Amino acid sequence: MVRARIIGTGSYTPRKILSNNDLARLVDTSDEWIMTRTGIKERHVAGDGEATSTFAYQAALKALEMAGITAGDLDMIIVGTVTPDMLTPSVACLLQHKLKAYQAAAFDISAGCTGFLYALSIADSFIRAGNCSKVLVVGAESLSKITDYTDRTTCILFGDGAGAVVLSREQGQQGILSTLLYADGSCSNLLYMPGGGSAHPASLETIAKRYHYLKMDGNKVFKTAVKALEDCVVKILEKNKITGDQIALLISHQANLRIIQAIAKRLELPKEKVFVNIQKYGNTSSASVPIALDEANRQNRIKKNDLLLMNAFGAGFTWGSALVRW
């Protein structure tokens, strides 16, 4: 059977670190308050001259190196992001140029924190259809650029970085077994950034109203995310006739430690089967899952033929899951 197999992973986070204590000097918060409610200790943020394509490029280089191929071997580049360098052209096109992968098609996916899984599912479809042999899938963000550091409810959450995988068209049982994707646009006003698009283009008024920063109803997002992700992971296991105890590692979107724990509890997974790095990076949106995947891979937390379950939830609302045999 033809499958899209992950043959390389890579990740990159900027050097600059913003700790909880740093944030406590900006807004009314504390290390204890943030850790208790989110599990986040620190996050990496972009430095001068760094943008989303900067991080995507570094993560891509590492993934290509592990895969043992060159950028010239790629048929397609897909980037999941909500923080592109600019509205157009896409981060994927900028990345294509940096990599000199001029033979590859390139485009972005905007699906909130689920962007990487949406991109992974699209790449899987292209490979299964026989239209691509090698695809680079990247999740990359510069959320610090759209974070309001006067808003204590959101500034504690977000960080920057990128993760990448190389998918290869191969025969066998290893690779992406299944993906499930969902969306509910009726909840778009619960997590959004109103400024900068065609509805509210940049102006003195939109800047004064702070429209160019993320807005979020944290409580409603949390409650919806827990239920949606619990249902999603159960459905993908049922679809593939797999039980929770067969999962070797759960890699959830690193948005909130309590959400990750709720999903693990639903699947009755012990701690050693749940990958967590939120304490180091915070919520990196589309970059979250591929960064965690790369770290788990390089820490030898995943072995050949292991079943890996990934899931994410984000603005839109969007959510989804992917089941992979390593």
What is the meaning of each model-derived region?
Residues 6-8, 34, 63, 74-77, ...:
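Buried hydrophobic positions in well-ordered alpha/beta secondary-structure cores of metabolic enzymes
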Residues 12, 80-85, 111-114, 139-144, ...:
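Acidic, glycine-rich active-site loops and adjacent beta-strand->loop/helix elements
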Residues 1-48, 151-223, 227, 231, ...:
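Condensing-enzyme catalytic core mediating Claisen C-C bond formation in acyl metabolism
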Residues 128-162:
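Flexible, glycine-rich active-site loops centered on histidine and acidic residues
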Residues 225-230, 244, 248-267:
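Active-site pocket-lining segment
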Residues 291-311, 320-326:
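Catalytic phosphate/nucleotide-handling subdomain of diverse soluble enzymes
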Residues 59-75, 231-248, 296-301:
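Phosphate/pyrophosphate-binding loops at sites that engage ATP/ADP/AMP, CoA/4′-phosphopantetheine
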Residues 35-37, 41-54, 81-135, 265-293:
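Conserved catalytic cysteine-centered active-site region
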